[in-house]
Amino acid sequence: MGVSRVLHVEGGTPLKGELRVYPAKNAALPILAASLLTPEPITLVEVPRLRDVEVMLELLAHLGTQYAWEGRTLHLQTPEIKSTHAPYELVGQMRASFIVWGALLARAGEGHVSMPGGCAFGFRPVDQHIKALEALGAEVWEEDGTFHARRTRPLSGRVVFDLPTVGGTEQAMLAVALGGEATLVQAAVEPEVVDLGHFLALLGAEVEGLGSPIVRIKGAPRLKGGTYRIIPDRIEAGTYLLAAAATRGSLTLEGVRPDHLDALLDKLWRSGHRLEVGEDWIRFRATPDPAPFHVEAREYPGFPTDLQPIATAYLATVPGQSTVVDRIYPDRFTHVGELARMGAELYLRDRILTVQGRRLHGAQVKALDIRAGGALVVAALSAEGASEIEGVYFLERGYEHLTERLQALGARVHLRESPVALAAD
């Protein structure tokens, strides 16, 4: 017999208290990749201590980066690129690590990156990454599951994306930041993309149009170092707000960017909850009788796809009928079957999820990706009775100190070890 960890949740207790939002993982990862662009020292203040960040640091160390933690501050320096190959054993763990491709191409003139891995929901191609690098003048090819790129001059050109793409936009920005120049059309406008642009500007690149569909970037022949603070995590903040809503609790978030959460805050307000918003704080008080609503996940500033599963879990507790559509990842519904085990009434047809809210009950469930895991936690917190959530690995990729933070809000949760039968030889 082997042993795995499960999250044990005794549901039915409203979450109450205050919470400071951690920095955004989805902003930290491309900024970490951007550290490859300069030989100068970089200091990142308040970096999330998550498994995905550790994987990215392992990859950067393989490529030549030296780093050291000082509390939650991270010091990095890449005097030289020691390898231009990002191996499968690291890239296969996390899709975001694919972003080092553009940075390697800019700094070393070539980059070789294995097919990305990470959360297995829907079809998430890298065609827009390839299109961008080719439009900028790189030679790109794929062989045996590895993507290769090479350049003979600084990359420059005009990239017209087929659709807004966060990863593709970030890849192109990194590829031209060191001596190149580009105009990106249909660029992603997400806060994490804007944060990367601000970081590149700190290093010496000229970036215009951040937060708009047309971004212009002019790289510098040599980038400098600097100190940077990463934006707060809007997905973590949204998860805790939805957990407070599902448990009919109250919550104050500090160190948050409310303007990054407009779509969610509007839904919660329309659902009947009370909200007060300041420059960097949100006060939330749940109504005991919330109303259902329609969720349509879209590109920013629309409703975030990463909050769609968590919102689904909340709506499963709201009397009445709600509907959920994901325009980013239309098949992002790995959480539906597990929520059904807790008594949720969910009907998926033609990629439209209909949710009939009711009181949930505890069950043994399994997280199949990061945000599906967040959805199960929210459902379990609101449910009657005990739940056990397998797949703690996914939760630890997306939520720092989740158990301790929920306990601080009054939740009855703890991690425990569970025996697992091992496969026979």
From Swiss-Prot:
It comes from the Bacteria. GO terms for biological process: cell division; cell wall organization; peptidoglycan biosynthetic process; regulation of cell shape; UDP-N-acetylgalactosamine biosynthetic process. The modification 2-(S-cysteinyl)pyruvic acid O-phosphothioketal is found at residue 119. Its main location: cytoplasm. It catalyses: phosphoenolpyruvate + UDP-N-acetyl-alpha-D-glucosamine = UDP-N-acetyl-3-O-(1-carboxyvinyl)-alpha-D-glucosamine + phosphate. GO terms for molecular function: UDP-N-acetylglucosamine 1-carboxyvinyltransferase activity. InterPro entries: Enolpyruvate_Tfrase_dom (IPR001986), Enolpyruvate_Tfrase_sf (IPR036968), MurA_subfamily (IPR050068), RNA3'P_cycl/enolpyr_Trfase_a/b (IPR013792), UDP_GlcNAc_COvinyl_MurA (IPR005750). Pfam families: EPSP_synthase. GO terms for cellular component: cytoplasm. It is an enzyme of class 2 (transferase). UDP-N-acetyl-alpha-D-glucosamine binds at residues 95, 124-128, 306, 328. It is found in: Cytoplasm. Phosphoenolpyruvate binds at residues 25-26. The active site is at residue 119. The keyword Cytoplasm applies. Keywords: Cell cycle, Cell division, Cell shape, Cell wall biogenesis/degradation, Cytoplasm, Peptidoglycan synthesis, Pyruvate, Transferase. Pathway: Cell wall biogenesis; peptidoglycan biosynthesis. Transmembrane segments: none annotated. Its EC number is 2.5.1.7. NCBIfam families: murA, PRK09369.1. Belongs to the EPSP synthase family. MurA subfamily. HAMAP family: MurA. Cell wall formation. Adds enolpyruvyl to UDP-N-acetylglucosamine. This is UDP-N-acetylglucosamine 1-carboxyvinyltransferase. It comes from Thermus thermophilus (strain ATCC 27634 / DSM 579 / HB8).
